[in-house]
Structures are given as structure tokens and as C-alpha cells.
Amino acid sequence: MKTVLHIAIFSAVVVAICGVRQNYGNVRYNYTELPNGEYCYIPRRRCDTTEQCCKPYDTINNFAACGKAWPEDKKRKVNKCYICDNELTLCTR
């Protein structure tokens, strides 16, 4: 019983010190049809303009953008859709 109590106290101290990380990679987005008949591009998909990217449901705290990123082959940067947090400037990739 004493061991269980020590583990519980240790876990509480670790959470208090480190905090709980927020997962910014799972921002909900609105998957809609574009005027040209195609559907919007999900985050991490290659894009040409921001209008092609799916917009987040929460447009007050988040925004969608099309920006440069290194692809897996790392030969040259390409444009990919992102959903970013307004306050923390963290974007999904």
C-alpha cells in the first residue's frame, strides 16, 4: 500500500512540474467543397493557395494557411496546408 501511495505522489508531482501537453495536431477542420467542385485540402497536403486549404471550425482561435515545408525526400521546399493557433503560433504539419 505504501508503494502505491508513493507512485501516486510521484505521478502527481511529475504532472505538476511538466504539465499536460496539448495536442495541436488534432484541430478540427471543416471539410467542404470548393467552388471548382474539388474538396478542400486537409492539413499536410500540398497546395498552391490558402483558399484550397480546409478551414478550422474555430476560426477565432485558429486559421488555415498554405506555407513552405520540407517534404520527406528533403530535396526542395513545397507548399503544404496548415492549421495554426492564433495565440501560440503553433501549426499542424
From Swiss-Prot:
What residue range is the signal peptide? 1-16
Q: Which cysteines are joined by disulfide bonds?
A: C40-C54, C40-C81, C53-C66, C84-C91
Give the UniProt subcellular location, in the record's own words.
Secreted
Q: Where are the transmembrane segments?
A: none
Q: In which tissues is it expressed?
A: Expressed by the venom gland.
Pfam families in the cross-refs: Cys_Knot_tox
GO terms of molecular function? ion channel regulator activity; toxin activity
User: What GO CC annotations are associated with the protein?
Assistant: extracellular region
Query: Which keywords fit this entry according to its UniProt record?
Result: Disulfide bond, Ion channel impairing toxin, Knottin, Neurotoxin, Secreted, Signal, Toxin
**Domain of life assignment:** Eukaryota
Q: Which family does it belong to?
A: Belongs to the neurotoxin 27 (Jztx-72) family. ICK-72 subfamily.
UniProt free text on domains: The presence of a 'disulfide through disulfide knot' structurally defines this protein as a knottin.
The job of this chain, per UniProt, is described as: Probable neurotoxin with ion channel impairing activity.
Name of the protein this chain belongs to? U36-theraphotoxin-Cg1a
**What organism is the protein native to?**
Chilobrachys guangxiensis (Chinese earth tiger tarantula)
